[in-house]
Amino acid sequence: MKQSLTSICGAVAAAAVVLFSCGQPASDASAKFEANSATIAQVFADFEAESDDFFTHFNAEAVWRGTGLNAPDTVTLEQVTAKYKAAWFKYDYELVSPTNFLPGVNPQTKAVDGSVRGYFEWNISKAATDSTEAKSVRVKVYESFDFNPDGEIMYTQVYGNLAAGYAYLDE
């Protein structure tokens, strides 16, 4: 009887260790994902508002993966800042799809890591001028955002046919 009781207590203790040790990282990753999703919601709001606050969500060493035709492997925050400010001067942006953020995973471990992914649709418009009519185009994109432990965006990639959208607006 004493041996059975010891075995049962040992099994319960082992199960508790497994349960609590497995539950903590998932809970931590879930909390990081929720916090990072809120950051991305604000990033999108700042982008639509053409606000310099947009850039404050990124670490100074943040990079974007070059995903366009013949794009460089990485694009720095400084380069993106110049490009986005020029684009804001020329175009208006509106997120027209719901923000259904998806949890990302670590590429090596495949474990949920707090990164944020999603499929979004943006309306990009160009105002009329004396010689042109107003135009707009909808572009569907896949975007991902990886964060450092301080909640700053470190890595971003955007896949979508943005070049075709801009070409249409500028023709």
Language-model segments: residues:
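Short, ordered coil/turn segments that flank beta-strands lining enzyme active or ligand-binding pockets
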Residues: 20, 60, 149
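A solvent-exposed, acidic/Ser-Thr-rich amphipathic alpha-helical stretch
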Residues: 52-116
